[in-house]
Curated annotation (Swiss-Prot):
Keywords: Ribonucleoprotein, Ribosomal protein, RNA-binding, rRNA-binding
Quaternary structure and partners: Part of the 50S ribosomal subunit; part of the 5S rRNA/L5/L18/L25 subcomplex. Contacts the 5S and 23S rRNAs.
One GO term describing the cellular component: cytosolic large ribosomal subunit
Family that this chain belongs to: Belongs to the universal ribosomal protein uL18 family.
The protein's name in its UniProt record: Large ribosomal subunit protein uL18
Coiled coil: none
Lineage: Bacteria, Bacillati, Chloroflexota, Chloroflexia, Chloroflexales
Summary of the function given for this chain in its UniProt record: This is one of the proteins that bind and probably mediate the attachment of the 5S RNA into the large ribosomal subunit, where it forms part of the central protuberance.
GO molecular function: 5S rRNA binding; structural constituent of ribosome
């Protein structure tokens, strides 16, 4: 049996979590993806498959303010922006989907900043 790569293991964890975590119009899903360089967050209504709000470190307006900061500080900034955009769209409560990543480091920093920004999960 071949050894599974870390990416394959993460995808398996994500599938396992997604069996139970569903976003609704009243309580959409806050989905996080983390790459080696960037972090992305989306607020998704799974009933219609639509993204209601999104933020990431690749956006030009965010990227300019994040130069010279650590990846954890960048994740905090993305968490604050996603909370602001979700609240502007009328979203107060979300279900957190960590995307198969450990709830530690950048993923935790993004979640804490989103909570501090007013989102409840």
């Amino acid at each position: 049996m071949a050894k599974r790569t870390p990416r394959e293991l993460r995808i398996r964890r994500h599938r396992r979590v997604r069996k139970k975590v569903h976003g609704t119009p009243q309580r959409p899903r806050l989905c996080v993806f983390r790459s080696n360089m960037h972090i992305y967050a989306q607020v998704i209504d799974d009933t219609v498959g639509r993204t209601l709000a999104a933020a990431s470190t690749v956006e030009p307006e965010l990227r300019a303010s994040l130069t010279g900061k650590t990846k954890t500080e960048q994740a905090k900034a993305v968490g604050a922006v996603i909370a602001e955009r979700a609240r502007a769209a009328g979203i107060e409560r979300v279900v957190f989907d960590r995307g198969g990543f450990k709830y530690h480091g950048r993923v935790q920093a993004l979640a804490d900043a989103a909570r501090a920004g007013g989102l409840q999960f």
